[in-house]
């Protein structure tokens, strides 16, 4: 699902549940604020936990020596922090159940 598809789906669910249609620009802004807020929190080293869904954290990757795949030359890869998502129990169970039902 792309960000655009997510925005369309959010508007559909909101309309079905509340009978009110949201403007596309309002849904787009809401998604943008959510993503920007999460990005800034991770950039400050903060952990994000959404109960029932999962948590976002940072993993540290130490510096290492890699290889340029084209030339085979050794290259120093600097240390970095990368975002990591750990799905929550409820999300794992719902995905597993849905995939099992679709397989039958």
UniProtKB/Swiss-Prot annotation:
GO terms for cellular component: chromosome; cytosol. One of its GO terms (biological process) is DNA recombination. Keywords: DNA recombination, DNA-binding, Transcription, Transcription regulation, Translation regulation. Pfam families: Bac_DNA_binding. Belongs to the bacterial histone-like protein family. NCBIfam families: hip (TIGR00988), PRK00199.1 (NF001222). This protein is one of the two subunits of integration host factor, a specific DNA-binding protein that functions in genetic recombination as well as in transcriptional and translational control. This is Integration host factor subunit beta. The lineage of its organism: Bacteria, Pseudomonadati, Pseudomonadota, Betaproteobacteria, Neisseriales. The gene is ihfB.
